[in-house]
Structures are given as structure tokens and as C-alpha cells.
């Protein structure tokens, strides 16, 4: 019996038994060898002998002698069956080296080259796995026991080998070093000539390792066979060779079926082309792409049937289907963080290969990755893939792409590159980390671009390690050149957890969350959606873990990938979620979605400063440079704030005022954390996330103001904003349901209309362009253009400037009147006063602030008196219409007139109210708005700021938080009131004075532009826009470079701008709409520069240069319209 056991373990005599071999001997005596009920790994380990092949026989030096690594069954075409461990002699290779002709004792034939290895190579050892990533090694050992190990070569550093050893639930990695004399060692005291000797030594004694090497990890996955035949380029197959079985799903051009290749008894996937489709060329291009790519993590093409329709593409069959469904339905105990990271690593490896081959995928998403045995993942669906001949590929007009996975530059310009695939990989990584959640939950497809434009990014998923989230954020850099390459991403996965394991990191993250849960704020702040109802749903998905049907908001009911994804995603109960917020009872958590109007408000109050920054729904830059707390900010600071960095307030910038700014109270892009905890991302990532606002950091000062805002009014279109104007970015979270009607509803410079008409920006704008957008008006371009002039010289006083150009005439008085209730910047006492006023429903008039005296900044007393005359005259004309609202609204300072909308319509759009006001009233309100710009900033700062923020979404939010349902919301949330503007007054005096001439110009311009203000989007046709472009080109050609040329060109440009803004909603295709918005934005920028030109440039060449830019933008508009 002893002799049998000695033979079993490969020892010649008892003396040859090592301590390790003794262990195997005892196991062999107690159990049968390779019994059927034992796991494969243990049965192999029981037979494994560390001294195997330590001494090479004389025949093993033959270079043509190979050994089989896997079993292979012959299936025609002169192939040869081989069994694992069998020796064979190689006679030659086919044209591409993927098949070799071999001879064994059983005969001669073709075998796959990657199924055999030279008899004297390392691959013959069961413990040597070749090039394997660190993450893959941890995955391969995840089901092992103490002493399970493997030896691998680094994927990123060829030639560098390591030992990966599992012990007590963790995998340890030891680098194998090479001494100067060529010997190998892990511990410098023990050096060896060969790797096999080193492994044998450490199988007997630990000698620096955590434990001895006992059980080699099995090689689970056979390599992919590239092509089922050694014959040259044999892709065309006989249709009769395929037996079609059941349908697996639908693809872009047809359907996918499971089939059997009868010739080889091989299960395959068959993609068919719909007979009535005209996409034959695209379908065949997909097959051509697949012929060129061969990688273990890319789905392999087996053949095509293209002689006659229906056309087939036959690929290898992946057992577990697409990754998206697999993640949603898997056992999360089995598919742990280690497995998820392993999957992500495989995908990055495949994309690195495509990157090197100059291919782009263009549709990278979880739904287009397939899962096989042992969590093998392969990238599939190359229907949109292209071989890159240049740096970018421009898709044809009308091409469809999955918006939520598509990079911004691709949405705006139809241009794709490998960097746009990197963006999609970041979204795919988010899908993996959330077990298949739909990206941007609760956010409409039409809103995604605008959110991204404002640097909004998805929050970090629960339990996601910081390093993984940093990688996601790196993939989501706005500028494509700032994104990493797939080679860098793959390398990052390789080195991401050198000092720890992902399991430890995930447990640490979940532990942090659990600690927060004990403190009552364990909930991760929900994604900020863009609509009132979806905002409430987003809150529910955090508050109701026991109601998975509430998890996905709008994202579940929409087709996120256009035609590529089913319209309805499966419900996803989330795995790791803290208990519901203790402040909400069970009934509240289970309320129907439409009833839960104020849930998010309670969440914000509960978490105070930890609520995530919502995506602003106004113009990308409209409110950014108007942060209320940046009253002392310099012009450079304002520019930095406009260009993407966090919108930190002056308080946040000073640790003494807001220590939380540095210890973790800030919230980057929707992810929330507790004060005192380390941030989710490293400091360098903070610069990339501009959705961290001062309103979050300064929320403590406003707690008293929030005390009366337990619930939001459902009538308010922006129900996600906490009380107080300091929450500037909360104001524009929501959009109207009906996007086409949004433009009509909020037609004049209001958030809704302007947002739907706002040009998309594929690139981040400069600070000036953001400043320009602050008060942009869709219906009154001329005033907005002048507004730019004003802002150019008043950068230092942005917080208190008004924006008549962007304020609807009938909205202007409301802005002035509301200034008292929403000027948190003016001090805590002022905020408390405002809070009391709004909490009481504004039933009684509050003490109005003294009327601002004559303008110290540059207006004469006469002009100031004229202001008052116009105001009183205007208020005398409109009291009858606004009588109902005046009874409820908190009175404004004396100067503001009573030009407001009807009472009881809190969500009414400003443009609608403007329509009710009538022509004369509008003109007077406009005049008032212009005059208000020039009031003394030190004394009329609040009124000025009331004009400064005309964006309606922001408008109703603050006030509605504390008002009873019947109280109308006044669209003024003067967020940027300058309570202490005295330091800036000196700087502003000359700048405002310099713009006195432009004020009068603005008045006349506004009067002339009154009709366009009421233009409905449906009345502007394609022909009107084209005629307007021709008129502008004609004006440019007829005019010389003299000063007089500007007025004519400017007028034609403003007409074109007005028509374009009204026409944008008529464009049905999303891609063209994005491009058209960008073109409108360029046009406006050029017009603004042109208007400034007479005052700032006297040289002809400057004007010529402006004209050339203007012509370029006009041509772009014309091209898009003709498209």
C-alpha cells in the first residue's frame, strides 16, 4: 500500500517524501483518487507533485516535441483528437499559425496551436498560468482554500512573474526576482536556477511566504479557437449546416438565435439580418470587422452566410447571455467584488486590443458584453464598430447611438474615437458596480447632454472603492484628450489594489456606510433627476429598500440605448443598502410616487450639508457665476468657477468659516459623505467636479431657513430645492415633461424655454462664455448681447448685477419684490427674516427696505428720478391684474412695481405671464429692469440680484419650500444678493458708468425685439431660418469695416438668432438638435463679440475677424437646417 501511495505522489522511495508530500500521502490513504464527488481543483491538487518534471529527460530537448494542455475533439477538416498531457510532434503550421499539423501515437492531423505547448516550457506545469492580471489571479483563487496558488506573468510587464497565494480568505502576491547571476528567488536567502525548483522549495517550506504552496489553481477556461478550420479564410458556410433553435434576442439589424453547427456538433449564436432592412452593407461590415479581431475577450466570428438572404453571422455561443441581464439576475454572494473587478479587467483587456488595432466599438455597454463559463466575459455586438483610418470617425446623418453611453463630443458632432469608447467604458464600469442599474436613473435622454455639460456626473455606487470611482471619473473627462487610454485603464486595474484587496476596500466602504447609518444619515444621496416627479422617485429609491419596484425611475421605463436595449429593464433590488431614513415612517416610504412630493426635502434636511449637488437645469453657465456666497470673489475666481471646478463659496474657501470644505462635507457630483470622513476621491479629482456648490457647504447657516421647508409643494415645477436662495444650483433641477412645449412655455429667458433651446456645448467654455450665459434670453437676444457687454466690465460685481436682457418683462417686478425673501448672502439675520416671511405665507406685508438712492455708479439723479416715474406709472397700470397676488406676496422695496402674474399660478412660466402683461406693460417692465441694473450696488444690491437670477426653475423652488399650497410662487429667488457689496462698489463704479450709453441702446433694442419675444416655435419654418441666414450673409457682404457696419450686421444677426431659438424645437432628431444648439451658441457668442467691438476695438481687422467667425457659424446653422 505504501508503494502505491509513493507512486501516487511521484516519489521513488520513502526518503523522497517531504513534509508536503506527507500531507498528500495521508490524504491519499484516506480517500480514493480523483473521485467523482470531489472538486476538480482538489482532485488535481491531490495528484500534484511539486517535483514533477524537475529533471528533464533527453527527449524533452526536442524543439518539435509538444504536450497537450487541453482535450480537443476532432470535427472534420483533417483535425486530430488529443487528450490533456499527451505528447505529440509538430510537423507544421497553417497560414496564420493558429493551427498546427501534429502527429501522435493515434495518428496525424490538425490541432489548435494554443492547445499545445513545448514539452520543456513552463506552460506544461499545472501551476503556471502565463500572462494573467492581478485581478484575474484573485478571481482564479477566489474559490480556493488555504495554500491554493498559481504562478503568473504580469500582463503589463512581460517577463515579470509573481506567485499569487491564498490564505485565510485573502490572496497574497509575491514578486519573483532575478538575481544578477540569473537565479530566481522570492526570499533572498533561497535562490534557484529554475522556476520549477523555486516552486518545489516553497511547497515544502514557507520561507517568507504566508504559507506553503499546496494546491495549484486549475486552468479553468480553454483558449478560444480562432476559426473552426485550418483552411485559409474559410468564412462562408453552408446554410444547411446550421440548425436554428430558439430566439435569444434582438440586435440592431435583426435577431439572434441559438443554433447548432451540425458538422461540429457545436452550439453557436446566429445573428440574422431582417429581410426587409436596407442595412445589408452595415451588416456585412460587422462581419468584416469580426474577421480581423482575435482576442480571448472578444466574441469570435465562426462564419457567415452571405450568398443569399437571410444573411447570417455565426459566432461562438456564450452560455450565460449578456452581461447586463447576468448582473441583474446573478447571486451577488457568488458574483462578489472580486468577480466584478475580474469582469471589468477582461473588458479593458479586450478594448486595449481594439485600441492597438485601431478599431472603435461605438456601442460599448453591459448589454453588448457576453458571459461564459467561469465568469469569462467577451465584448460583442460590433454592429457599430469601425476600423479607424484617422483620429476620429464621423457617423452619417441619422445614425442612432445610445445617448447615455455616448461621449459628449459624439453627441454634439457625431465624431467618434477610441476616447469616446473610453467614456462608454466608464459608464459600463458604473453598470458593473451597480449590478446592472440603468445609468443616470430618473434622467431623460434629452437631458443627459445638458447635465454632462454642467460637469454633472453619476454618483459613486454603494460600496464602490474610491480608486474604482476615480477611474470612472477619469473616463468621464469632458475633454477627450484628458481621458486615459485603454492601455492605461488595463494597467490601472492591474495595480489598483497593490496594498490591499478589492474585497477589503468594499468592506471598508460598506463599513463606513454602516457607521453613517448608525448616525442616522446612512443613506447615499440619490441621483438628482431633472424632473419633479423623478426627483421624488430618486429619493424613494434610497428610502424604500424593501420596495424594489421604486428603485429605477424614468431610466427603467425608457429605452436607454434607443433600439439596442429593451424598453423596460428588470427590477433591481439593490444588494447593499442601509436601513431607511428613520425620519420617514413606513407609510411615507411606501407612498405612490406621485404622492411623494416632499420626500427629498426631508432627506436634505436630515443630511444637512451632505446632500448631493443637483444638476442645474438652467443654462449651463447661467447661475454658476452668480453664486451668492462669492461676494468677495475675484474675477479669476469667478472664471475658475465657471469653467468646471467646484463652485465653492467664499465661506468654503476659508477653513475658519467652513472647515467641512476640507474634511469631507462637500459632495462631489452626487456622491455624499459624512463630515470628517475621508473623501471619495483624491484631491486632484476635486477640480474635475463642478457640481459641488457653496450652497451645500454653507447649508448650516441656513438651517433655520430650512426649518420651515419640510415639504415641497407639488405645484412647484422645481420641487427639489431646499428653502433659501443660497441653494442656487438646486433651483434648476427639473424640466417640464413635454420638451417641445417647454420652449413655448418658458420662451423668454426662462429656464425651461431657454434650456430646451440652449446650444449644446461639446467643449467647456471659457469663463466669459459662462458669464454670458448667466442671463441669456431666448426671446430677447439683443438685450442679452448687451448683457455680455455689461458683464465684461462688471466681472468683479457679478453677484449684484441685474440682467434685464434675460428677465421677462412681466417677471422683472416679481424679481425685485422677492429680493427680501431670498438673499441669504446678506447675513443670517436677513435670511431668518426671509424665512419667517415665507413661512407665514406672506400674508402680511413685511417692512420694505428703503428705496435705493440715486445711482452712485454712474446714473445721474435725473435718470434715477426717471426710473421712479416709470415704476410708478407701470405699477399704476397693472394693479387690477395683480391684485390677487399682491395680497399674498411679501412686499418688495418701494421702487419695484407690482407687475406680476396672476395669483394662484406658482408654476406659470414667465413667458406666459409676459404674454398676459401686454405690450406697453412689457416695455415699462423692461425699462425698469434696465434702470435697476444701475442702482447703487451698496444699497440696491438685493433688487439688482433679483434681476440677476431670472431663471424660472430656480424661481419657484425656494419660495415654495415653505409656502402653503395656495401661495403663489414668485419666480425670484435672488440667490446672489450682495449683502456686503461695499468692497466691490469701488470696482463697479467705473464699469457701470462705462455702460451708460449701452443702457439706452438696450432699451431701444428691447422695444424693437418685442414681437420676436412672442414668436411660437411652430411658426418658424426651415425656409425662414435659411432666408435669415442669407440676409445676414448679405448684410456682411454689403457692409464695409466701418463702425456703421456693425449695426446692420448686428440687427440681421439678432433676427437670425431669434428665429433659430424658436426653430430649435422643430428639429426632431436629437443629434441634429444638439448640433443646432451648439451652432446657436456660437452665433450668439460671435454677435456678442461684434456688439462689444465698437466700444473695444477701433481697428478694421478686428471687425473683419469677427465677421469671419460669424460667417462660419452662419454656415454651420445653414448646413444643419438643410440636413
UniProtKB/Swiss-Prot annotation:
Q: What is its main location?
A: cytoplasm
* Name this protein carries in UniProt: Tyrosine-protein kinase ABL1
Residue numbers covered by motif Nuclear export signal:
1083-1093
What are the residue boundaries of the Protein kinase domain, all occurrences included? Answer: 242-493
Q: How is this protein activated or inhibited? A: Stabilized in the inactive form by an association between the SH3 domain and the SH2-TK linker region, interactions of the N-terminal cap, and contributions from an N-terminal myristoyl group and phospholipids. Activated by autophosphorylation as well as by SRC-family kinase-mediated phosphorylation. Activated by RIN1 binding to the SH2 and SH3 domains. Also stimulated by cell death inducers and DNA-damage. Phosphatidylinositol 4,5-bisphosphate (PIP2), a highly abundant phosphoinositide known to regulate cytoskeletal and membrane proteins, also inhibits the tyrosine kinase activity.
Provide the positions where the record notes the PTM Phosphoserine: 50, 229, 446, 559, 569, 618-620, 658, 682, 717, 909, 970
Residues with PTM Phosphothreonine:
547, 734, 750, 812, 821, 844
Question: Motif location (Nuclear localization signal 3)?
Answer: 761-768
Keyword list (alphabetical) reads: Acetylation, Apoptosis, ATP-binding, Autophagy, Cell adhesion, Chromosomal rearrangement, Cytoplasm, Cytoskeleton, DNA damage, DNA repair, DNA-binding, Endocytosis, Kinase, Lipoprotein, Magnesium, Manganese, Metal-binding, Mitochondrion, Myristate, Nucleotide-binding, Nucleus, Phosphoprotein, Proto-oncogene, SH2 domain, SH3 domain, Transferase, Tyrosine-protein kinase, Ubl conjugation
Any one GO molecular function term: ATP binding
UniProt-reported outcome of changing residue 315 to I? Loss of inhibition by imatinib. Loss of inhibition by GNF-2
Kindly state the positions of the motif Kinase activation loop in this protein.
381-405
Motif Nuclear localization signal 1 mapped to chain: 605-609
Q: Where is this region: DNA-binding?
A: 863-961
Q: Oligomeric state and partners? A: Interacts with INPPL1/SHIP2. Interacts with SORBS1 following insulin stimulation. Found in a trimolecular complex containing CDK5 and CABLES1. Interacts with CABLES1 and PSTPIP1. Interacts with ZDHHC16. Interacts with the 14-3-3 proteins, YWHAB, YWHAE, YWHAG, YWHAH, SFN and YWHAZ; the interaction with 14-3-3 proteins requires phosphorylation on Thr-734 and sequesters ABL1 into the cytoplasm. Interacts (via SH3 domain) with CASP9; the interaction is direct and increases in the response of cells to genotoxic stress and ABL1/c-Abl activation.
Q: What is the effect of changing residue 112 to S?
A: Strongly reduced inhibition by GNF-2
Q: In the UniProt annotation, what is the result of changing residue 506 to L?
A: Strongly reduced inhibition by GNF-2
Q: What does this protein do?
A: Non-receptor tyrosine-protein kinase that plays a role in many key processes linked to cell growth and survival such as cytoskeleton remodeling in response to extracellular stimuli, cell motility and adhesion, receptor endocytosis, autophagy, DNA damage response and apoptosis. Coordinates actin remodeling through tyrosine phosphorylation of proteins controlling cytoskeleton dynamics like WASF3 (involved in branch formation); ANXA1 (involved in membrane anchoring); DBN1, DBNL, CTTN, RAPH1 and ENAH (involved in signaling); or MAPT and PXN (microtubule-binding proteins).
Where in this protein does the record put region CAP? 1-60
Family assignment?
Belongs to the protein kinase superfamily. Tyr protein kinase family. ABL subfamily.
Which residue intervals make up region (Disordered)?
504-990
The consequence of residue 497 to L is: Strongly reduced inhibition by GNF-2
Residue ranges with Low complexity bias: 969-979
How the cofactor is bound: the record states: Mg(2+) and Mn(2+) were both present in the kinase buffer but Mg(2+) is likely to be the in vivo cofactor.
